[in-house]
Curated annotation (Swiss-Prot):
Compositional bias ranges of the Basic and acidic residues kind: 253-272
Domain PPIase FKBP-type: 321-407
Record function comment: PPIases accelerate the folding of proteins. It catalyzes the cis-trans isomerization of proline imidic peptide bonds in oligopeptides.
GO cellular component: chromatin; nucleolus
Location (main, coarse): nucleus
Acidic residues: compositionally biased ranges: 65-88, 103-136, 236-252
Matching InterPro entries: EF_Hand_1_Ca_BS, NPL, PPIase_dom_sf, PPIase_FKBP_dom, PPIase_Fpr3/Fpr4-like
The protein's name: FK506-binding protein 3
One function term, GO molecular function aspect: peptidyl-prolyl cis-trans isomerase activity
Region (Disordered): 46-136, 191-223, 236-297
EC number: 5.2.1.8
A Pfam family matched in the record: FKBP_C
Length: 407
């Protein structure tokens, strides 16, 4: 049993029922896992006998024969010492055997062999009897005593490994139930650790063999290192030669060329200074102003109609009798849009035929295709005092017109 319970890792619950008069092993051979027993509890149901005897849990284990083995070892050593000492009688017997003929020697040897065999047989029987006596010795140890009258259970802390030869037995009138845990004990891991260590040693040996390195003597190391140092010195010498050649190959500049180059550099510096000054002046003036947009020219036509050309356009100009297609947006003086044609079919009318208000007939004349114009029409050239949906009476109207077609 082990006391190293703090280093044990619980794996699963463990239970065992021990009935009176029936020894039971704590660990099954089919499941060799260490266990830690932490509780012993009595079953109040009486099993044996009419009297209510308390139940005592015992551990049974073979007796330790360390003293007997030591005694046997001492006896064996004494026997060996006696055998090493040759008596005078034995020496005389040996001389007689040497002097005898071969036949007599064979008979004497045969007789001695028979006697030795008989003695060996007697020794074996005696040893067997001693072994039988030792094997029959069983020691028992009391773990706890429980009774329904004075104690139902007892806390324990027993760790049992698969290698231990022990059994539990109960004496009394009641069964005792043990509980605890199956555990991962360090003892169980020793074999695995040894195998892993052996495997690592083998891998290390293989790595050393694979590297193909040999242990060289100091003289051989000096020779190899000396060769490497020689190669390094030769390479360094080659590099120095190359540097010398590079220095020799640099062209010699004539004094005239140097002066000429210096003069050119001075000119470039002066030009750079001028550029810097000019650039600085521009910066002081602020960002480059955008090109001023041309002012729109407003022209006043018949009846007070005013026009402003935004885009001149191209092609022939519209005149009286021309049929033009236009896009337009009509606004009041306050900027409110009351009519427009910006998509779909353009609006077509004949110029000067009275198909539109008078301000349109006058304001569209002279426009070209893709031309854009703003036409400002006073009330007298529009709808006058007439009130229309979205157009109050006496309203000044402004139209932005674009010609898309002239026929």
């Amino acid at each position: 049993m082990s006391n190293n319970a703090n280093n044990c890792l619980p794996l699963a619950s463990y239970t065992l029922a021990v009935f009176p008069g029936i020894p039971v092993a704590p660990i099954e051979q089919d499941f060799p896992v260490s266990v830690r027993i932490t509780m012993a509890a009595i079953d109040p149901a009486r099993i044996e006998g009419d009297e209510e005897e308390p139940a005592t849990l015992r551990i049974l284990k073979p007796a330790d024969n360390f003293d007997d083995e030591d005694d046997e070892d001492d006896e064996d050593e004494d026997d060996d010492d006696e055998d090493d000492e040759v008596s005078a009688e034995d020496m005389a017997q040996i001389k007689k055997l040497i002097a005898a003929n071969e036949d007599g020697l064979d008979e004497v040897e045969g007789g001695d062999d028979d006697e030795d065999d008989d003695e060996d047989d007697e020794m074996e029987f005696e040893e067997d009897d001693e072994d039988d006596d030792d094997e029959g010795e069983i020691e028992d140890f009391v773990v706890c005593t429980l009774s329904p009258k004075f104690g139902y259970q007892q806390t324990l802390d027993l760790v049992i490994t698969p290698g231990e030869q022990i059994m539990f037995e109960v004496t009394g009138s009641y069964a005792i139930h043990l509980s605890g845990n199956y555990i991962e004990h360090p003892y169980d891991m020793e074999d695995e650790d040894e195998l892993l260590a052996l495997g690592e040693d083998d891998e290390d040996d293989e790595d050393e063999l694979d590297e193909g390195e040999y242990d060289l003597s100091p003289d051989e190391d000096e020779v190899i290192n000396g060769d490497e140092r020689l190669v390094e010195l030769m390479e360094q010498d080659d590099e120095d030669d190359e540097d010398d050649e590079d220095e020799e190959e640099e062209p010699v500049v004539e004094p005239k060329k140097i002066l000429k180059r210096a003069a050119e550099e001075k000119k470039q510096e002066k030009a750079a200074k001028k550029a810097k000054v000019a650039f600085t002046k521009n910066l002081e003036q602020g960002p480059t102003p955008s090109e001023p947009k041309p002012k729109l020219v407003t022209r006043q036509l018949e009846g007070g109609v005013k026009i402003e050309d935004r885009t001149v356009g191209e092609g022939p100009s519209a005149k009286v009798g021309s049929k033009v297609g236009v896009r337009y947006v009509g606004k009041l003086a306050n900027g409110k849009v009351f009519d427009s044609n910006s998509k779909g079919k353009p609006f077509y009318f004949s110029v000067g035929k009275g198909e539109v208000i008078r301000g349109w007939d006058i304001g569209v004349q002279g426009m070209k295709v893709k031309g854009e114009r703003r036409i400002i029409i006073p009330p007298g050239m529009a709808y006058g005092k007439q009130k229309l949906p979205g157009i109050p009476p006496n309203s000044q109207l402004t139209f932005d017109v674009k010609v898309v077609n002239i026929k």
